[in-house]
A protein has these predicted regions:
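Alpha-helical recognition/docking segments in bacterial nutrient-uptake
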Residues: 4-122, 183-186
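Glycine-rich phosphate/diphosphate-binding loops that line cofactor/substrate pockets in enzymes
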Residues: 3, 123-132
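Short acidic capping loops at alpha-helix termini that bridge into adjacent secondary structure
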Residues: 131, 161-165, 216-221
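Short acidic/polar active-site loop segments enriched in Thr and Asp
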Residues: 64-65, 129-131, 192
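Hinge/beta->alpha junction and helix N-cap segments in small-molecule ligand-binding domains
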Residues: 13-23, 41-50, 72-75, 99, ...
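Short helix-capping segments at alpha-helix termini
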Residues: 32-35, 90, 155-161, 188-189, ...
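Flexible loop/turn connectors
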Residues: 178-289
Length: 289
């Protein structure tokens, strides 16, 4: 355990302009400043090279008491793990949020992504859908966990998952989903419903459907995750599972303080989420009571 206290916590996040980060950082800062900590924030843009620069800098300066970090491309092999090990060996507690690197045994505060993926597909199944597709993010851990839940929901209902109906896209693809439109609709052609990785995907997908004259929910039902402002801005308001956002930030900060005060504290925490029903899902048959 480190003896010297700098009253300084570093926060590393992927995107400054995502709809999730501002409320998360608000939650983090509120809790930390009450305890007398300053927060320094850096952004990776979900790029591993940028993450390397930031970690290097933190190790050189050596003036932090703890690190709260959203990993870059958490589903892919990461060349920066030794920097985290180095910080850990110096007695600096590290807490991940939203996702984690599977190779590092470090705690994480996040949404229960697997459970949410399962609940999302179960909601479509309950409303009579059986040909269900998914659009998931390939380079972030949340995408894999949401897919894992999606699979278990489908298999639990005795429905075979058609791999052709599951589309994987990465961070770079997300920047220009329009260019994937033909491909997306080809893959989802036989589906009556789709689980979207998040509201960003669902929002863009609903816009693409509009352009092609595909009616949501009559021709395609959409369930999304995050319940951000985008869910209500879409042409058809999206049924979505809320991300804990500010509550997640507060929890991460509380757990970080506990980890600084007690090196044996378990900083892991998963947030449950319950669906917010709007207009993007069609009932194909009456749900079983």
């Amino acid at each position: 355990e480190r003896q010297e206290r700098y009253m300084n916590i570093a926060v590393i996040s992927t995107y400054v302009d995502s709809y999730i980060f501002p409320p998360v950082v608000r939650g983090i800062e509120r809790v930390l400043s009450k305890k007398g900590y300053t927060t320094q924030i850096a952004f990776t843009g979900n790029r591993v090279s940028r993450e390397q620069d930031i970690l290097n800098n933190l190790i050189d300066k050596d003036i932090i008491d703890g690190l709260i970090v959203e990993p870059a491309k958490s589903a892919l092999p990461n060349p920066n793990l030794h920097y985290y090990q180095e910080l850990k060996e110096r007695g600096i507690p590290i807490l991940f949020f939203n996702s984690r690197y599977p190779d590092l045994e470090l705690p994480c505060v996040s949404m229960n992504d697997e459970q949410v993926g399962k609940k999302a597909v179960e909601y479509l199944i309950k409303n009579g859908h059986r040909n269900i597709g998914g659009v998931f993010k390939s380079d972030d851990g949340q995408g894999h966990l949401r897919y894992k839940g999606f699979l278990s929901g489908m298999l639990g209902a005795g429905i075979k998952v058609k791999d052709a109906n599951v589309v994987w896209l990465d961070t770079e693809d997300f920047l220009d989903l329009d260019q994937w439109a033909d491909y997306l609709f080809r893959r989802l052609e036989s589906c009556t419903g789709v689980v979207c990785y998040n509201d960003e995907v669902a929002y863009v997908l609903s816009g693409l459907c509009e352009k092609r004259g595909i009616a949501i929910p009559d021709q395609l039902s959409v369930v999304s995750i995050d319940n951000s402002d985008l869910a209500t801005l879409a042409g058809v308001k999206l049924t979505s599972f809320p991300h804990p956002m500010e509550a997640l930030g507060r929890k991460a900060a509380e757990n970080m303080i506990s980890m600084i005060e007690n090196p044996y504290f378990d900083g892991n925490y998963l947030f449950d989420s319950d669906i917010i029903e709007r207009d993007s899902v069609k009932v194909l048959k009456q749900p079983h009571k």
